[in-house]
C-alpha cells in the first residue's frame, strides 16, 4: 500500500493528472480538507479548481516518505518537500473504501528542523 499511496501523492504534482478533473474527483474524498502552508483551509472543490488550472508539472520532489497504517484501511503519510530554500513538512491521510483509495486530509507546514533528505 505504501508504494501505491506514494505514487498517488506524486500524481498530484504532475500536470497529466492535475489537469484531469475526473481523476481528481476519483482520488480526492468528498469530505477532503487541506490546510496549506499559508494557514488557509481548502475544501475539495477549491483544490480541484486550483490544480486543474495549472499548465505544467509542479517542480516538487518527495523526501523522507513514511506510511503508517493507523486504522482499518486508513493510512497516515508524512513527507518533506522543498519550496525554494524552505522545507515543507506534509501530512496526508488516505483511506481505502470499497476498493478505492482516496485522500481525505492534507496539511503543509513550514519545517525549520535540520534534516537529512532522502528522495523517494
Language-model regions, residue ranges each:
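A beta-strand edge to alpha-helix "cap/lid" segment located at domain peripheries
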Residues: 2-18, 31-120
